[in-house]
């Protein structure tokens, strides 16, 4: 192959999925000349699995991406076909927004944004190797011989590296949704010392809407009030498309059990690790034999298509078994398959090879993002993509990287978990992973992160002005409510008793009254004669901040303690073998992972509290005598 020089860039992003899109947009919006290389320009921001954005904990990630100046929230607001707020029966910390996407339009609109972004250049081309010299990024080589130079590279290769499609006894080299795999780049990564491993994921069949009997299913319409993902949008209105719920049964399970020896998961064909929280239908049936039924969600993939996604029925069983299995489900008796379910195996890295900035520890200027890092999900990928893109741009500008901590956002939790703890399976974000989830609500993502996004140059003035307006409105309303006094007049007490609340014995502020469990901002509207006409999102924020004030203050105290550990920096050149009384396992783990501070060290599996105490004493001595 004859190679030729084809251009010089500040940042090169390899991959055009959800991680690659956010990385490329972040870097270019921060003023860096950026090249995005993708196998197929028509598959940008493709949704090869579920046709939705958000969901439990994932909705938090999308809100945080948006607050930093990312695109995912803006894009789904333009292309959704149904919107629902999940977990509304629980507290606000776990409320999570989820939207069904028109997956074709989602991809088209995102591509249009990329094509019109200043300083961003797109190429449909396969990258086959990296040019690394003396542990530093120099550029890339493509299959056609084109060579591009760059100061930084973001690897966002998704599930394409040496990917294999598995359907029963059928097993072949291929990427998701019928696309080509990337079979050559992996060896280049191995050659520069990057450790790879194999993960697997899967997707359900797609079926023809015309072959489904919806009368045998439970309709799931969207919410009446549509809450936007992006803080740029005050409200959205749209005629929504329903999803449907049905269930497997004993007949379904019998088909699976009769053919379990043909399942690649159970006959040894698939040896790689799959996502724990998204098991295949055969896995669910075999692992939970006492369960008589499993939920199946029938989800539309767009407005102008008959494609339906069969959620909850991911499988790698042979095609004829899949058809037989589907036809046992109520409403699917005459089902026609459009696309067969499959499992896909692919190369990814052990993310403990990365710094918290998502730069590789041993290759300067090389960043990883998305499923390449061992995560699962569009939202997790996009979250890493925006941080990798930001930090690639900051490196080009010779500035310090942006590190989000566990108390800053779900993105911080996600990255810290991957980099510090590693993962033995595709990592999925969950609210239970966040220690400070009452502080990290999706409704306050802008209050936590937009100032930061503006400071680094990613949040533009239009978004920043909108943020300042919202922030000021919330603060002004909180201050006003503290000043409004409600007297203990008879009509007031009668009103309160009618709401099931205790009558007043002396005047009290409206702020204090809202704190009562049985009352809220809207219920007390009658008593608030000077109430302003505020947007619903501001009302919701004010209500939450008042009602959960005590709990929020306690978590802020916990964060203060946590940050004391995070501020105790560990020198890069520390020799753990020279520290007396440190256990052998701790020496090995700390030497391998090289934590940057005591907080990160304390979260490493195999490092005990006594090891941290020894390390603290050593650091005191080290800095005292330096």
Curated annotation (Swiss-Prot):
Record-level GO cellular component terms: cytosol
Cofactors: FAD
PROSITE patterns referenced in this protein's UniProt entry, alphabetically: GIDA_1 (PS01280), GIDA_2 (PS01281)
Molecular functions (GO terms): flavin adenine dinucleotide binding
Transmembrane segments: none
Residues annotated as binding NAD(+): 274-288
Keywords, alphabetical: Cytoplasm, FAD, Flavoprotein, NAD, tRNA processing
SUPFAM superfamilies according to UniProt: FAD/NAD(P)-binding domain
Residues given in the record as FAD binding sites: 15-20
GO terms of biological process kind: tRNA methylation; tRNA wobble uridine modification
Family assignment from sequence similarity: Belongs to the MnmG family.
Subunit organization: Homodimer. Heterotetramer of two MnmE and two MnmG subunits.
PANTHER family: GLUCOSE INHIBITED DIVISION PROTEIN A (PTHR11806), PROTEIN MTO1 HOMOLOG, MITOCHONDRIAL (PTHR11806:SF0)
Role this protein plays: NAD-binding protein involved in the addition of a carboxymethylaminomethyl (cmnm) group at the wobble position (U34) of certain tRNAs, forming tRNA-cmnm(5)s(2)U34.
NCBIfam families linked: mnmG_gidA
Protein's name in the database: tRNA uridine 5-carboxymethylaminomethyl modification enzyme MnmG
Gene name in the database record: mnmG
């Amino acid at each position: 192959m004859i190679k030729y020089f084809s251009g010089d860039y500040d940042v090169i992003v390899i991959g055009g999925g959800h991680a690659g899109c956010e990385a490329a947009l972040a870097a270019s919006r921060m003023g860096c000349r950026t090249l995005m290389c993708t196998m197929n320009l028509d598959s940008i921001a493709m949704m090869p699995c579920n046709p939705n954005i958000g969901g439990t904990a994932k909705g938090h990630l999308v809100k945080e991406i948006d607050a930093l100046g990312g695109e995912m929230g803006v894009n789904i607001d333009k292309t959704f076909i149904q919107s629902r707020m999940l977990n509304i029966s629980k507290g606000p910390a776990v409320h999570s927004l989820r939207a069904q996407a028109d997956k074709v339009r989602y991809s088209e609109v995102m591509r249009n944004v990329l094509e019109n972004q200043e300083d961003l250049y797109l190429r449909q081309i396969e990258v086959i190797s990296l040019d690394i010299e003396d542990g530093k990024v120099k550029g890339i080589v493509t299959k056609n011989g084109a060579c591009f130079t760059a100061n930084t590279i973001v690897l966002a290769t998704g599930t394409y590296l040496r990917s294999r499609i598995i359907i029963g006894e059928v097993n072949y080299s291929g990427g998701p949704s019928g696309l080509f795999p990337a079979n050559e780049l992996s060896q280049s990564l191995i050659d520069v010392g990057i450790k790879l491993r194999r993960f697997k994921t899967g997707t359900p069949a797609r079926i023809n809407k015309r072959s489904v009997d919806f009368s045998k299913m439970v309709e799931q319409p969207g919410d009446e009030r549509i809450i936007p993902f992006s803080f740029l949008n005050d409200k959205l209105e749209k005629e929504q498309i329903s999803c449907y719920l049905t269930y497997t049964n004993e007949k379904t399970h019998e088909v699976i059990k009769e053919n379990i020896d043909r399942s690649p998961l159970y006959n040894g064909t698939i040896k790689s690790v799959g996502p724990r929280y998204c098991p295949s239908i055969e896995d669910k049936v075999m692992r939970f034999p006492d369960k008589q039924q499993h939920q199946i969600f029938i989800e539309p993939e767009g407005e102008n298509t008959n494609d339906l996604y069969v959620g909850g029925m991911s499988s790698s069983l042979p095609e004829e078994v899949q058809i037989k299995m589907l036809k046992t489900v109520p409403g699917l008796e005459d089902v026609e398959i459009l696309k067969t379910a499959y499992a896909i195996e692919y190369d990814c890295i052990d993310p403990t090879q990365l710094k918290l900035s998502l730069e590789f520890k041993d290759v300067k200027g090389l960043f990883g993002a998305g499923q390449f890092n061992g995560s699962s999900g569009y939202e997790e990928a996009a979250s890493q993509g925006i941080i990798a893109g930001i930090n690639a741009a900051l490196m080009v500008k010779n500035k310090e990287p942006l590190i989000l901590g566990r108390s800053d956002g779900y993105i911080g939790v996600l990255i810290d978990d991957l980099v510090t703890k590693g993962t033995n399976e595709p990592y999925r974000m969950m609210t239970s992973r966040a220690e400070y989830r009452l502080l990290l609500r999706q409704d306050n993502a802008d209050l936590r992160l937009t100032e930061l996004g503006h400071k680094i140059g990613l949040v533009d003035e239009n978004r920043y002005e909108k943020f300042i307006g919202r922030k000021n409105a919330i603060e002004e309303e909180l201050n006003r409510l503290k000043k409004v006094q409600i007297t203990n007049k008879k009509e007031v007490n009668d009103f309160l008793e009618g709401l099931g609340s205790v009558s007043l014995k002396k005047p009290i502020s409206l702020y204090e009254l809202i704190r009562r469990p049985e009352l809220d901002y809207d219920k007390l509207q009658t008593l608030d004669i000077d109430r302003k006409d505020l947007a619903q999102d501001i009302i919701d924020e004010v209500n939450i901040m008042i009602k959960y004030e005590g709990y929020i203050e306690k978590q802020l105290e916990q964060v203060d303690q946590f940050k004391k550990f995070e501020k105790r920096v560990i020198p890069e050149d520390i020799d753990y073998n020279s520290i007396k009384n440190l256990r052998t396992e701790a020496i090995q783990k700390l030497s391998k992972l090289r934590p940057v501070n005591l907080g990160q060290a304390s979260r490493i599996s195999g490092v005990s509290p006594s090891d941290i105490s020894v390390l603290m004493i050593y650091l005191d001595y080290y800095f005292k005598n330096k």
